[in-house]
Amino acid sequence: MRTRAAVAVEAGKPLEIMEVNLEGPKAGEVMVEIKATGICHTDEFTLSGADPEGMFPAILGHEGAGVVVEVGPGVTSVKPGDHVIPLYTPECRQCPSCLSQKTNLCTAIRGTQGQGLMPDGTSRFSMLDGTPILHYMGCSTFSNYTVLPEIAVAKVRPDAPFDKICYIGCGVTTGIGAVINTAKVEIGAKAVVFGLGGIGLNVIQGLKLAGADMIIGVDLNNAKKEWGERFGMTHFVNPSEIDGDVVAHLVNMTKTPFDQIGGADYTFDCTGNVKVMRQALEACHRGWGQSIVIGVAPAGAEIQTRPFQLVTGRVWKGSAFGGARGRTDVPKIVDWYMEGKIQIDPMITHILSLEEINKGFDLMHAGESIRSVVVF
């Protein structure tokens, strides 16, 4: 069949809207009609050419929601008509990682997914002249129709709006999950969130959901103060407006008459800046503070700290897709949204057509959007 898609023909160039060929699902695969897709910084990272693993031509996009229209042989967990969210982190429930119950990083299709291919080593997309087009993060949601492995779709309730729940495919889950699954924040905790973009705001609402008592947001942009407060932030710090070291400032903020050591129980880096990652660790409480690294640093970047920071009880942890097991946890997060436990609507700042998709990247570069969503 043919489908409309925004194709990344080469790095550094705007996406091109065109008709492409899409082959139907093979064994263990499903075809999904994408109804809405978010535009994420990871898509921009690859399109810019900065991603060392970026390959072209490809159909980007990994934050979508849609309806199953066809299933291949052997598919049992979804059927045509089911509403689903594509998963760039699948859940096969059979590989050593899934069976360990210690990680969400399923390895079942990791090798081929990283090459922009389906599990059988081929692509379902091609140009009208037959030139293969690569998949992206196993999803390719910048196409009106896409094909995914069965293990890479989460079935969700049919009454949830596509243009909101698509954000659960990446940003919402990454932020809230880092709090709930990775850090396991408890009621009454003190936390600091570095970087108040879409991920940071979702960390903040995850902290509020978990019952954190003090939620400090750190950002160089004062406009983010109002955004943070909307989602549950209790204090705001702009590092450029304080005297002295931001770590010392944060430690002092978290001191109490009972605890004069100070430091946060949990910190979260949502910036991808390795200097900020160090500050986040060192703003943790001596003896038990945990710093969760969410932001993706540039290729080749390294983190540094003095070993004394770790010897005295601080912990560095990483979190990918919020530690969420996609097929199991994503439907629950959709339920949280539908039950009013978390907010998504305010973060969807722009709704665009496929023809306007490049405007979404422009808005991101200008810092004018939290999340732009393309609706098909």
From Swiss-Prot:
Biological process, per Gene Ontology: formaldehyde catabolic process; methanol metabolic process
Cofactor stoichiometry and binding remark: Binds 2 Zn(2+) ions per subunit.
SUPFAM superfamilies registered for this protein in UniProt: GroES-like, NAD(P)-binding Rossmann-fold domains
Domain of life: Bacteria
InterPro entries: ADH-like_C, ADH-like_N, ADH_3, ADH_Zn_CS, GroES-like_sf, NAD(P)-bd_dom_sf
Gene: adhI
Protein name stated in the entry: Alcohol dehydrogenase class-3
The keyword Transcription regulation appears for this protein: no
Role according to the record: Oxidizes long-chain aliphatic alcohols, long-chain hydroxylated fatty acids and S-hydroxymethylglutathione (hmGSH) in increasing order of preference. Shows little or no activity with short-chain aliphatic alcohols.
Record's GO cellular component terms: cytosol
Species this chain originates from: Cereibacter sphaeroides (strain ATCC 17023 / DSM 158 / JCM 6121 / CCUG 31486 / LMG 2827 / NBRC 12203 / NCIMB 8253 / ATH 2.4.1.) (Rhodobacter sphaeroides)
